């Protein structure tokens, strides 16, 4: 108050270099750096690149079969864990892989990887399921159409391609995500650590769920007669798999 009466000005505050907006001063000291991985236990196979996949199965005659959409429905029971590699492409939904998808993955990954330090392998079989199709302008009837091409059914939770060697996840994550975005179903790049984290997070959500109105409880108790619009798959998978789609947020 006396400064206002006397007309004195307030002292000018000078900002120091230690303010939040300024860069901290350089200080000498010991730095703690992460150890460099040695990859001593990694062995590169004789043929590290992805092998060529046949367009059609090498059998005398393939039997034509119905659609069998259960081939892409629900969770996968095969190729859900790592075998030799440390990084892979994880399918987040069901779908069919055509021969063109195999060629896209093979050419993209083989062009990127260094065969002296990296290797890749398939976790899905070659196309074996026959897809029939009739020509344009044909009338209805006349039996099932001729075989047009072959596909490989994939369920949610299956590994498509594994990559390993003397490399880290940051080096291959970009190319694996690039391949995953071109697949006919949702997919993403994962490592051993991230795959374990996804599984643990799902178990923790189920264990610490605070909402009593879960899909399993509503379907089991047949609340509001919901069982008349549900299928046996909904009771088995607790509503987490809807056809070829996977809904991980549902507990």
UniProtKB/Swiss-Prot annotation:
Belongs to the universal ribosomal protein uL16 family. This is Large ribosomal subunit protein uL16m. It is found in: Mitochondrion. InterPro entries: Ribosomal_uL16, Ribosomal_uL16_bact-type, Ribosomal_uL16_dom, Ribosomal_uL16_sf. GO terms for molecular function: rRNA binding; structural constituent of ribosome. Component of the mitochondrial ribosome large subunit (39S) which comprises a 16S rRNA and about 50 distinct proteins. Keywords: Mitochondrion, Ribonucleoprotein, Ribosomal protein, Transit peptide. GO terms for cellular component: mitochondrial inner membrane; mitochondrial large ribosomal subunit. SUPFAM superfamilies: Ribosomal protein L16p/L10e. It comes from Bos taurus. Residues 1-29 form a transit peptide. One of its GO terms (biological process) is mitochondrial translation.
């Amino acid at each position: 108050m006396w400064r206002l009466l006397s007309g004195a000005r307030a002292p000018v505050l000078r900002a120091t270099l230690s303010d939040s907006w300024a860069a901290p001063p350089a200080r000498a000291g010991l730095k703690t750096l992460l150890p460099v991985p040695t990859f001593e236990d990694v062995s590169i196979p004789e043929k590290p690149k992805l092998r060529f996949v046949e367009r059609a199965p090498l059998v005398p005659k393939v039997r034509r079969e119905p659609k069998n959409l259960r081939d892409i429905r629900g969770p996968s029971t095969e190729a859900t864990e790592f075998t030799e590699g440390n990084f892979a492409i994880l399918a987040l939904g069901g779908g069919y892989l055509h021969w063109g998808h195999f060629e896209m993955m093979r050419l993209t990954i083989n062009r990127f990887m260094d065969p002296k330090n990296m290797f890749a392998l398939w976790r899905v079989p070659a196309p074996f399921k026959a897809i029939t199709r009739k020509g344009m302008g044909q009338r209805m009837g006349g039996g099932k159409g001729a075989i047009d091409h072959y596909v490989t059914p994939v369920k949610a939770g299956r590994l498509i391609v594994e990559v390993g060697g003397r490399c880290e996840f940051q080096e291959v994550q970009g190319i694996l995500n690039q391949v995953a975005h071109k697949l006919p179903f949702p997919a993403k790049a994962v490592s051993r650590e991230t795959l374990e984290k996804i599984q643990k997070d799902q178990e923790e959500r189920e264990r610490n769920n605070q909402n009593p109105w879960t899909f399993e409880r509503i379907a089991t108790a047949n609340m509001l007669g919901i069982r008349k619009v549900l299928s046996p798959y909904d009771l088995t998978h607790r509503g987490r798999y809807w056809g070829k789609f996977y809904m991980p947020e549902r507990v």
